[in-house]
Amino acid sequence: MPVAASAIYFLNLRGDVLINRTYRDDVGGNMVDAFRTHIMQTKELGNCPVRQIGGCSFVYMRISNVYIVIVVSSNANVACGFKFVVEAVALFKSYFGGAFDEDAIRNNFVLIYELLDEIMDFGYPQNLSPEILKLYITQEGVRSPFSSKPKDKPVPNATLQVTGAVGWRREGLAYKKNEVFLDIVESVNLLMSSKGNVLRCDVTGKVLMKCFLSGMPDLKLGLNDKIGLEKESEMKSRPAKSGKTIELDDVTFHQCVNLTRFNSEKTVSFVPPDGEFELMKYRITEGVNLPFRVLPTIKELGRTRMEVNVKVKSVFGAKMFALGVVVKIPVPKQTAKTNFQVTTGRAKYNPSIDCLVWKIRKFPGQTESTLSAEIELISTMGEKKSWTRPPIQMEFQVPMFTASGLRVRFLKVWEKSGYNTVEWVRYITKAGSYEIRC
């Protein structure tokens, strides 16, 4: 369900209207007064970004010293409304040189009105791509892109890009060296018990691309996901090759991906935007490969002494290594003195966060390291208060490793001129919320 916005307002922190545009006649002109009275003056701006007053809903967001308010009179997709605001602000910043505040709006109100007419039609979001809009809406106002075309480049077809199927990529791009960079970046989230049992685990990942390709290329990406391999084996009428396959959950794609072909062939086919973009996002809950296992042992020796022993083992391949490994081991607030030994890296006590911070610059695969510590506590009078042990937290980054097991099987580029391309693929796994109870 789209936004179907009735009006949009830009207000300063005092509630003064800087700019507004009404797209439908189903709301009155006093909507901004209702927003001031029921939301701004009642100090409820930070509580909920969506409020319903009367028969209208207000979807608002603060950017710098400006409130952007979308008024909706019917049922609408609120998430789509926030997405529109974020992309609209990015568009304005691209025109204003990176700034978006009250002064920028006052200095460029004519341009903003022109953009508001282009990016939303009868309350429905349209094209918000800065690259496409700048072809026919310039800094000075209404001006044809043909009046300042470069002599050594083909003239972009603005009409095709605004109304055609490839509105995210302009024509006439040319590079001396055609390259594609693909990064699979994953964050692994874990909650493990003190005995090493996995209580909760999942991976959130994204496929990032940088494309420097001439012309209008078609790209096809093959992954070792279960659905794609099964579909490929059906089309070739033979069983799929043995090997690790994964099942992707909650997959979302960039608008450039051909969803019709994905639904029928289960392949990621697309005409890429120029430069950097996020091709897809996904989530995995089954078959996660944990990069580290942590086994903590904490003994309380009376009221004033503790012994801590933490063993960290890397589970990934022996030829790989992790960078920037940080292990935060919680200790009681009344810690007075610490003595510890580590087999690898360096450790110190940080009283501001009540943790032993163990840092290892480079952690090879299939190895283990140990921290042993003796902790002296301040003696307190009265009854002993039990210490609620927070979990151990880890930070790390493992190049060329994916916790999901996702791999690129192929990346093909077709373009009518038949040029050669260079493809680069990189894998990175980072720690999300990686916690071990102790």
Curated annotation (Swiss-Prot):
GO terms for cellular component: clathrin adaptor complex; clathrin-coated pit; Golgi apparatus; plasma membrane. It comes from the Eukaryota. Residues 177-437 form the MHD domain. Adaptor protein complex 2 (AP-2) is a heterotetramer composed of two large adaptins (alpha-type and beta-type subunits), a medium adaptin (mu-type subunit) and a small adaptin (sigma-type subunit). GO terms for biological process: endocytosis; intracellular protein transport. It is found in: Cell membrane; Membrane, Coated pit; Golgi apparatus, trans-Golgi network membrane. Belongs to the adaptor complexes medium subunit family. This is AP-2 complex subunit mu. It is a peripheral membrane protein. One of its GO terms (molecular function) is lipid binding. PROSITE patterns: CLAT_ADAPTOR_M_1, MHD. Subunit of the adaptor protein complex 2 (AP-2). Adaptor protein complexes function in protein transport via transport vesicles in different membrane traffic pathways. Adaptor protein complexes are vesicle coat components and appear to be involved in cargo selection and vesicle formation. AP-2 is involved in clathrin-dependent endocytosis in which cargo proteins are incorporated into vesicles surrounded by clathrin (clathrin-coated vesicles, CCVs) which are destined for fusion with the early endosome. The keyword Cell membrane applies. SUPFAM superfamilies: Second domain of Mu2 adaptin subunit (ap50) of ap2 adaptor, SNARE-like. Keywords: Cell membrane, Coated pit, Endocytosis, Golgi apparatus, Lipid-binding, Membrane, Protein transport, Transport. It comes from Arabidopsis thaliana (Mouse-ear cress).
